[in-house]
Amino acid sequence: MLRNGTYFSTLIPAEPWLFDYYTRMGYASVFQYSVKEITVPEFIPSKEITVTSEVGCQKEVYEYLNSKLSGRTCCIQHSFEDFQVVMADLILSDGILVTARSENQINGLAIVYRRDKQLIISELFAESKDAEHSLLHHIKQFTGCRHMTQLLPPEKEQTQYPLGMARIINAKEVLQLYASAFP
């Protein structure tokens, strides 16, 4: 990685025990998340919003997700090619990506997967409460689950859990970047 000009390496361990393994390899746990438990109430979704499960990697879906993620204070941005890999992995693990549209424009998106016997919403963006409720209703109908766990950016007043790890590959270049940004 050093010869390729890589400054940092990041990863998300697939299993909790891998945090210890990657720590021994020089990685540090630096990305956290909080959770919110959701019970989807009984309601009739808006007729003006169409919700569909996405099966392909549409550039429009990527651009919507990317624009929402770029609004976060600290978030690793993925290229479209990385997004295609994430989507392929999501499909292999029986996960789904669901979009809400109104007047043929995306106004909401959710990425959902199963972990053990839980349903996890790793990303949920909606332009309105109607879009959010329509997404949750569709997920409930599709999976049969009323109870879901939503992963959130870390919040000070909530418990935080480790999510991702990072390792500095080229310390000299990283220190130079830091020094130039904070003289």
Task: Tell me what each language-model feature is.
Residues M1-L2, A131-L136:
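Glycine-rich acyl-CoA binding loop
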Residues M1-A14, T143-P154:
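Conserved GNAT acetyl-CoA-binding A-motif
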Residues M25-P45, S122-K129, H137-P183:
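Active-site/acyl-donor-binding loops of N-acyltransferases
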Residues Y22:
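Short sequence/structural segments immediately N-terminal
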